[in-house]
């Protein structure tokens, strides 16, 4: 699994801590971490939590990433931004139980975490434990396990409802403020990382017109 890490500007200084915790846990599982930044608070490209949602949607819908880990001060804003787009089901994860139940009950493809609220001494340990529960035990197996059939049925219903209520991502991108969109893909390593992994030629062609 290719896991993308995205940080917005208010918590960008923690990018290295988050990346280290994520890699420590998931690389031994065989997963790959791709860090899209922000990398530091003074990066030239400043991402807001709204732009985290835009970038996450581009990565997931294009196949450039299989999963996105992101967040903000509380994790709420980034979660709302990600869930504004088709092809993204983002959970709010504060602790390992959140991580495990989201993976097995909701079976989404992104999480948003609080990187300021409650992030004190031992914060990196909580990240590691969350990532272990999120990525170490599979997905969609139900919790409790005897509830797996109705839970996955509800997940399929949610997918159908979202398919009916969202328009294709490229139409979403064409409809939003183009300066906002350009800012979301302005990271110093975006082009290098994205085009090497993008599987959607139409989306890639559109993104190239914005760079």
Task: Please place each PLM-identified region on the residue numbering.
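Short glycine/serine/threonine-rich phosphate/pyrophosphate-binding segments
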Residues: 14-15, 53, 75-81
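A short, small-residue-rich loop immediately preceding and capping a beta-strand
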Residues: 65-71, 90
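A short beta-strand-loop structural module common to alpha/beta enzyme folds
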Residues: 29-45
């Amino acid at each position: 699994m290719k896991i993308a890490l995205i940080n917005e500007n208010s918590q960008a200084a923690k990018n290295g801590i988050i990346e280290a915790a994520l890699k420590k846990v998931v690389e031994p599982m065989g997963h790959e971490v791709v860090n899209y930044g922000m990398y530091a608070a003074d990066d030239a490209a400043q991402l807001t939590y709204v732009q985290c949602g835009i970038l996450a949607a581009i990565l997931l819908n294009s196949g450039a990433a299989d999963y996105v880990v992101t967040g903000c001060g509380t994790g709420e804003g980034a979660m709302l931004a990600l869930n504004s787009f088709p092809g993204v089901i983002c959970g709010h994860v504060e602790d390992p139980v959140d991580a495990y139940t989201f993976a097995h009950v909701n079976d989404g493809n992104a999480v948003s975490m609080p990187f300021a609220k409650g992030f004190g001494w031992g914060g990196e340990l909580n990240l590691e434990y969350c990532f272990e529960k999120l990525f170490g035990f599979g997905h969609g197996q139900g919790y409790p396990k005897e509830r797996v059939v109705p839970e996955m049925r509800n997940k399929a219903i949610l997918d159908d409802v979202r398919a009916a209520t969202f328009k294709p991502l490229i139409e979403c991108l064409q409809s939003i403020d183009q300066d906002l969109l350009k800012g979301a893909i302005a990271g110093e390593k975006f082009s290098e990382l994205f085009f090497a992994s993008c599987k959607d030629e139409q989306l890639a062609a559109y993104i190239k017109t914005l760079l």
